[in-house]
């Protein structure tokens, strides 16, 4: 009985202490208990970084701060536990609470939305930084007196002042690095914009279509919550109102729009995946007409199969991309809410598999009988049709458009003024003279570094003596994006801790690319060489240099592999892997390569298979963590050739891919940048196994003619495969123009008025037009060989002159730049009967008889290829 009273007294004391510490952040008791359980599991997983990450939560924080911190740590991705400390997350939590108290809309936001769409720092797979505090300080006074909807629009204008669109590589820069660069791809723009909105207590989430159905690309944008509902905006692309963007029409053709939600979210949206750390939701119905389709998985006798893995796949980039991976229930059923296009549905269990195309327009259920086994060789052709094109269906007044356009131009000037603070060539040449460096080479690196130029100048100035010979090789080894955000400390760490070869010290190129280079794949660059060199003793490092297999064994025995915890796909840094002793397979592979390089052993991820490799005894050696290692003699030579009837040279991830069968599904090999595939025939050395070659010919309306060839690679037998692109139907005339009306509106010179013309109505500052320009730049030589006559049409002299002075220099030599009398962008669509709208660019090919041969409106990837195929 006495023990019972002591227990009651203890509960009362804890309760009174809780009251003194303030109100709960997690107000629902059952939810709070679930967070505590998850926090305990995460703390156990991250036990090797308890002091750095978790200890602060037990330091007597105010109750709401403690619960908020436990919530964040409980559901964080593994990389965040490995590479960031608890005080980093606590400072962001305090900034979030301060923002909630600052703005009038803070008290109107439901707790659940604040918890999942304001509090988390991470948006996607970016490097995390202190942007929340920086952005809040800059935005607070600017938006404090606005309504929530007005504040959203104003924040997006601020984002446009800082950042505009330009394509970059797949690694996602941090928000502050994107601001420093002043441009980013859509994934970086949307990550930055979500970070800015959350910094001022506006619930925001990055949403994206992982692959378009009608075009070989994807797109990311932002949803914001205001007035009791979710709205969308184009990141760094301000419109006068919410729910208006250039991608409104393309999104109506999407097959999936989704977003990952941090934590145990209880919202009403359609759930694609429920993980213990996050939820993936399907929000396609916010943008397009949808339909739920079903897969019924059966065995060879027709009985339902439980727990079969099922993927709903979409053709894009010459592969079948899994929009959703799920599992059949006890009735053999699973489902997916999607758009009205075509998909490939693939099911597998216990080595058996089945697949079938589904036309969502006409079907709602596909039966998949698991009767196929790996090894059967055959070829089949399929046509995959995207959802039908539809108009955007929104409009804003001309006065609002003009006011917004004027403001956008002003914001462009603000951004340009910032860009003029970057180092110029005169300063670069003076620095080169002082340091006795090649001025043109130094200027190249400084020009590419943009707002990060000080890191490069400081690095150049800190090198001396014979080591300076390795300055440019190090800067050449990292990517262009690395130049824009690599810290000075990373450059110095690699420079000071690399084992430089002497005059006869082996292959210098190998050293530059695979020892000196800090970049392994898409990881966050932190100093790691000095860190790892201190952690491993000299005897071990010496043994690794004579036998890199010693490091392989150390990694196998020391690093625990967790396949699920790093759901953000942001790799752990090498230092983070060492400290945590837990990693996902990809981060483990990066760690192995980085550790090899730190010890003077050349290492890399093999470009096609992405397997870690080390260079030893003049050969590359695969590292098969947990897999059977193949010798070079066991590999099979595959020769690829292009069919002579192909009307273009096939390009990897555009016209074809190679896929290897693995655990019931085919997965693409990554040969995108491999120079061997630059000409045909070419040879690849591959592991024996079951393979699929996918080729695709995307037609002008987005339909794909796909060819699937299943084949085996057998040890000791060379194999040849021919890349065959299916022929498109005969070219159709889409409509016929009255050429007199065309000439009356557009001042086309008489000398070319009877020839084939490419007309392009332009909006140079918008992302769809920039994609079109990038297509033309990539196909410039081919267009010139075709003697293509391109006429770019602009609204005004400023747009025209700015374009000519910038990108115009990279356009085909026969291009003309004109201002039509009316800028009637609906002239061509109206003639063809296609849906018209206000989205640019409008690109058309007209022959000398006024017949419209080709038409593209708005966002479209591959216009350059389309035009080349259409020109005669």
Tell what function each PLM region has.
Residues 747-776, 789-793:
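Short active-site neighborhood of thiol/selenol oxidoreductases, capturing the structured segment around
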């Amino acid at each position: 009985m006495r023990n019972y009273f002591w227990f009651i007294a203890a509960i009362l004391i804890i309760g009174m202490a809780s009251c003194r510490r303030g109100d709960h952040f997690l107000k629902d008791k059952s939810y709070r208990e679930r967070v505590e359980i998850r926090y305990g599991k995460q703390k156990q997983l991250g036990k090797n970084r308890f002091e750095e990450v978790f200890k602060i939560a037990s330091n007597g924080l105010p109750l709401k701060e403690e619960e908020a911190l436990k919530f964040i740590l409980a559901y964080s991705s593994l990389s965040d536990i490995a590479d960031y400390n608890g005080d980093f997350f606590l400072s962001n939590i305090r900034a979030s609470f301060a923002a909630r108290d600052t703005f009038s809309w803070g008290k109107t936001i439901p707790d659940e939305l604040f918890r999942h769409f304001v509090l988390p720092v991470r948006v996607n797979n970016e490097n995390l930084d202190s942007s929340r505090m920086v952005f809040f300080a800059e935005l607070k006074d600017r938006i404090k007196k606005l309504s929530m909807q007005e504040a959203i629009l104003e924040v997006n204008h601020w984002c446009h002042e800082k950042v505009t669109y330009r394509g970059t590589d797949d690694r996602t820069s941090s928000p502050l690095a994107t601001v420093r660069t002043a441009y980013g791809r859509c994934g970086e723009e949307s990550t930055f914009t979500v970070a800015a909105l959350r910094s001022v207590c506006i619930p925001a989430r990055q949403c994206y279509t992982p692959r378009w159905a009608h075009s070989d690309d994807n797109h990311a944008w932002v949803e914001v919550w205001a007035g009791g509902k979710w709205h969308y905006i184009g990141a760094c692309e301000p419109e006068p109102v919410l729910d208006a963007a250039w991608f409104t029409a393309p999104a109506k053709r999407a097959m999936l729009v989704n977003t990952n939600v941090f934590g145990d979210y209880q919202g009403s949206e359609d759930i694609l995946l429920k993980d213990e750390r996050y939820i993936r939701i399907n929000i396609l119905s916010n943008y397009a007409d949808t339909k739920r389709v079903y897969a019924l998985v059966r065995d060879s006798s027709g009985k339902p199969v439980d727990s079969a893995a099922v993927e709903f796949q979409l053709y894009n980039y010459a592969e079948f991309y899994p929009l959703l991976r799920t599992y059949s229930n006890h009735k053999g059923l699973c489902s997916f809410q999607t758009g009205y296009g075509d998909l490939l549905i693939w099911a597998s269990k216990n080595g058996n598999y089945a697949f079938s195309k589904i036309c969502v327009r006409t079907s709602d259920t596909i039966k998949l009988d698991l009767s196929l086994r790996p090894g059967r060789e055959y070829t089949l052709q399929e046509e995959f049709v995207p959802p039908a094109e539809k108009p955007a269906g929104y409009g804003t007044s001309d006065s609002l458009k003009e006011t917004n356009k004027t403001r956008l131009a002003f914001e462009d000037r603000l951004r340009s003024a910032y860009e003029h603070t970057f180092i110029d060539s005169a300063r670069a040449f003076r620095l080169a003279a002082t340091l006795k460096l090649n001025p043109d080479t130094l200027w190249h690196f400084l020009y590419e570094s943009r707002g990060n130029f000080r890191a490069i100048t400081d690095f150049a100035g800190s090198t001396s003596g014979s080591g300076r010979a390795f300055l440019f090789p190090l800067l050449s080894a990292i990517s262009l994006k690395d130049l824009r955000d690599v810290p000075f400390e990373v450059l110095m760490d690699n420079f000071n801790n690399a084992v430089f070869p002497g005059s006869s010290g082996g292959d210098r190129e190998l050293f530059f690319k695979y020892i000196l280079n800090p970049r392994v794949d898409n990881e966050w660059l932190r100093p790691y060489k000095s860190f790892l060199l201190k952690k491993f003793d000299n005897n071990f490092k010496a043994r690794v240099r004579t036998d890199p297999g010693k490091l392989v064994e150390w990694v196998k025995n020391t690093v625990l592999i967790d396949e699920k915890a790093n759901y953000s796909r942001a790799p752990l840094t090498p230092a983070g892997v060492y400290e945590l002793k837990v990693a996902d397979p990809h981060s483990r592979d990066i760690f192995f390569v980085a550790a090899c390089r730190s010890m003077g052993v050349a290492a890399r991820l093999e470009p096609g298979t992405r397997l870690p490799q080390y260079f030893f005894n003049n050969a590359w050696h695969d590292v098969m963590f947990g897999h059977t290692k193949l010798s070079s003699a066991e590999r099979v030579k595959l020769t690829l050739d292009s069919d002579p009837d192909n009307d273009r040279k096939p390009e990897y991830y555009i016209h074809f891919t190679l896929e290897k069968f693995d655990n019931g599904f085919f997965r693409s090999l990554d040969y995108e940048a491999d120079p061997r595939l630059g000409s045909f025939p070419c040879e690849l050395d591959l592991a024996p196994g079951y393979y699929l070659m996918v080729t695709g010919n995307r037609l002008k309306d987005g339909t794909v003619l796909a060819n699937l060839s299943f084949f085996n690679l057998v040890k000791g037998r060379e194999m040849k495969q021919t890349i065959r692109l299916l022929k498109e139907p005969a070219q159709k005339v889409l409509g016929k123009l009255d050429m007199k009306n065309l000439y009356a509106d557009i001042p086309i010179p008489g000398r070319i008025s009877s020839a084939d013309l490419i007309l392009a109505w332009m909006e140079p500052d918008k992302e769809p037009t920039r994609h079109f320009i990038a297509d033309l730049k990539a196909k410039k030589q081919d267009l010139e060989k075709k003697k293509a006559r391109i006429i770019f049409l602009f609204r005004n002299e400023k747009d025209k002159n700015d374009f000519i002075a910038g990108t115009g220099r990279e356009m085909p030599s026969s291009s003309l730049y004109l201002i039509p009398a009316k800028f009637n962008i609906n002239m061509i669509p109206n003639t063809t009967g296609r849906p018209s709208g206000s989205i640019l660019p409008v690109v058309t090919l007209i022959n000398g008889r006024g017949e419209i041969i080709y038409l593209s409106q708005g966002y479209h990837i591959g216009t350059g290829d389309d035009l080349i195929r259409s020109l005669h």
